[in-house]
Regions:
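Catalytic P-loop NTP-binding/switch module of NTPases
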Residues: 209
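Nucleotide/phosphate-binding catalytic cleft detector across ATP-hydrolyzing
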Residues: 1-178, 195-197, 206
Length: 209
């Protein structure tokens, strides 16, 4: 399929959004209201919901491993895999919130594989890559949209959404780096075997040159 841009609007935000993080909720709210107003005038239609991308200085990945001893050999079910994934999501991450989880692989015996369902084992080890951000970064962003009375359809991790559109699957399979140079931040995402393996946002950008 193809994507067509029907309208575009922007507001100067350097005084209240710094390195991708909302610092002044009121001013961010005002900018959002103005953007929606301009878009609706251009489109001559009402915008009901919006998709919001989150990135910024605090966004990065952390790895986690969940071990589960089954006591006896049994066939690994989807319910068991889901239970391990739920345990990973519930892990504390020090004043941060998990934005998205990328399952890496599962270790069964001495073997690693992407899909363990149907394999017989008495032990399973799940490896996960958690994309996290400061809790207040996500909260301030959501609060700004709430105060502007703009309904959010979904909250997306911006680098993942951009890479999905711009990076060919063959490159992700072979291994590649996706680098997004911004004004105040630079985002680096590493892909290998079709999966995200590392992501970080560096607080340096074009304004530092």
């Amino acid at each position: 399929g193809t994507l067509q841009v029907l309208a575009y609007a922007q507001e100067e935000a350097t005084s209240f959004i710094r390195k991708g993080l909302v610092y002044n909720i009121d001013k961010t709210c005002q900018a959002l209201v103005e953007i929606i107003k301009n878009l609706e005038e251009t489109l001559d239609s009402k915008i009901a919901k919006v998709y919001v991308g989150i990135s910024g200085q605090s966004v990065h990945t952390i790895k986690s491993v969940i071990n589960r001893s089954l006591g006896k050999t049994e066939i690994i079910s989807q319910n068991l895999v889901d239970s391990i994934s739920d345990e990973n999501i519930g892990l504390p991450v020090d004043n941060k919130v998990i934005l998205e989880v990328i399952p890496q692989e599962f270790k069964i015996g001495d073997n690693y594989q992407k899909d363990p369902v149907g394999v017989a084992s008495d032990h399973i080890e799940g490896h996960y890559l958690n994309i996290v951000a400061r809790e207040d970064a996500r909260k301030n962003l959501l609060h700004s949209f709430e105060k502007a009375d703009i309904e959010i359809a979904d909250l997306l991790v911006s680098p993942l959404a951009a890479a999905k559109l711009l990076v060919p699957e063959a490159d992700k399979r072979a291994g590649c780096a996706f680098i997004d140079f911004g004004a105040e931040t630079t985002t680096v995402a590493i892909f290998k075997n079709e999966l995200l393996r590392f992501l970080t946002v560096i607080p340096l950008g074009g304004n530092n040159i």
